[in-house]
């Protein structure tokens, strides 16, 4: 009998942090929530909480150690933490001036460095799971900034872009860990040397869009994200690493259409805060 799967949810804020985990719990997952506002320990609903501040990348090893000891080895890791300040759209590089560069360091840590360290620890955790374990997926809650430059999101966008590069890199570099391939009519399976089907490591930069391919900003839908993340967690093969999706239709490939037009846009929907 296989062990109960474990969702490690890093960055459990008041929106997605309350909407995504119940979807996994209903699917039979043990749930671990991590945020700086939480206190360590099991909760009445069975969830396990861990306190951590992701502006400090060295917090990640301790989080993984606690989860392994108290709950079990994570089978799915979601990185959802976000922290940044909007830059001055008239002078965005002023955020890197000596008096304000700390906000750049924080944005890069929370949205870039810390999640990439989480990728490394997730890889180590996934490797210790039985080969046939479903999941072994790391999902990063991304946005359009790895494609498009918004005038007041220099620091945030640099961090998101760095993480997107790392996740894409991981999806290629660790593809070999899906073992040798055996092709059958109409199906592609990944098998070990004993002929048993294997589930490989998977990495995703998940990005909800409108039906026209534009960013949803604050309107990101937690239920839709939970459904898509669960779908990614339960597939046995790597889907597109840049997993753009819409609330009603799931995955959609928007390509590069018109993204850079937002660089000079002063339209409110391009300057408002949010993810």
Label the model's feature ranges.
Residues 12-23:
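N-terminal Rossmann NAD(P)H-binding glycine-rich loop of SDR-like oxidoreductase domains
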Residues 27-42:
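Conserved glycine-rich Rossmann-like NAD(P)H-binding loop of the short-chain dehydrogenase/reductase
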Residues 44-59:
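Rossmann-fold cofactor-recognition segment
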Residues 55-73:
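Conserved Rossmann-fold cofactor-binding substructure of NAD(P)-dependent oxidoreductases
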Residues 78, 118-122, 166:
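Hydrophobic positions on the long internal alpha-helix
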Residues 78-92:
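Conserved NAD(P)H cofactor-binding loop of Rossmann-fold oxidoreductase domains
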Residues 83, 95-117, 127-176, 186-193, ...:
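Catalytic loop of short-chain dehydrogenase/reductase
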Residues 186-275:
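C-terminal helical subdomain
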């Amino acid at each position: 009998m296989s062990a109960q799967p474990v969702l490690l949810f890093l960055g459990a804020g008041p929106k997605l942090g309350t909407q995504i985990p119940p979807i996994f719990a209903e699917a039979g997952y043990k749930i671990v929530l991590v945020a700086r506002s939480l206190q360590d320990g099991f909760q009445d609903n069975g969830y396990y909480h861990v306190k951590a501040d992701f502006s400090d990348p060295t917090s990640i090893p301790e989080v993984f150690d606690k989860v392994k000891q108290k709950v079990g080895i994570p089978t799915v890791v979601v990185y959802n933490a976000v922290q940044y300040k909007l830059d001055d759209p008239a002078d965005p590089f002023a955020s890197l001036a000596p008096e304000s560069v700390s906000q750049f360091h924080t944005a890069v840590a929370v949205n870039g460095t810390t999640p990439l360290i989480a990728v490394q620890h997730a890889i180590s955790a996934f490797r210790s799971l039985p080969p046939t374990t479903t999941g072994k997926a790391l999902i990063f809650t991304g946005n359009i900034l790895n494609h498009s430059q918004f005038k007041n999101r220099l620091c945030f966008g640099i961090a998101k872009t760095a993480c997107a590069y790392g996740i894409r890199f991981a999806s290629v570099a660790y593809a070999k860990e899906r073992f040798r391939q055996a092709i059958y009519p109409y199906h592609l399976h990944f098998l070990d040397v004993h002929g048993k089907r294997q589930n490989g490591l998977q990495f995703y930069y998940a990005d909800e869009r409108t039906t026209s391919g534009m960013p949803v900003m604050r309107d990101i839908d937690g239920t839709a994200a939970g459904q898509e993340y669960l779908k990614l967690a339960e597939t046995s093969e790597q889907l597109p690493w840049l997993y753009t999706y819409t609330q009603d239709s799931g995955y959609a490939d928007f390509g590069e259409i018109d993204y850079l037009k937002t660089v000079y846009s002063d339209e409110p929907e391009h300057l408002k805060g949010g993810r």
